[in-house]
Amino acid sequence: MDINIIEDKNNALLNRHEVKFDATFKGSTPSRLDVRGKLAAMLNVPLELVILQKFENTYGMSAANGYAKIYEDAARMKVVEKEYVLKRNELPEAEVVEEAGE
């Protein structure tokens, strides 16, 4: 999967970066977790601070566009984001257990 960042805007009021991007991929549409992981690696931020707000596939093509928010700290993220968005973007239990064991 290749991700091309279209816009990276700093939102100082909410202590976050807002990123608009295009993604191209082969095969099936990647999972939200895969996209978040790739964005976190590209921007050199922890996966837990990346909120994938929108990820829409382009009909008939192996491409998608999306919108993500990267917070500076988890406390601010929990204050700003709605509960369902946090739940949609939380890590699976296996991932959390692995990180705690390291």
Swiss-Prot record:
Domain of life from the UniProt record: Archaea
Positions in coiled-coil regions: none
A biological process term (GO) from this entry: translation
Record has Ribonucleoprotein as a keyword: yes
One Gene Ontology term, aspect cellular component: ribosome
Entry keyword annotation includes RNA-binding: no
Keywords: Ribonucleoprotein, Ribosomal protein
Pfam families cross-referenced by the UniProt entry: Ribosomal_S24e
A GO MF label: structural constituent of ribosome
Stored InterPro entries: Nucleotide-bd_a/b_plait_sf (IPR012677), Ribosomal_eS24 (IPR001976), Ribosomal_uL23/eL15/eS24_sf (IPR012678)
Family stated for the protein in its record: Belongs to the eukaryotic ribosomal protein eS24 family.
Protein name per its UniProtKB record: Small ribosomal subunit protein eS24
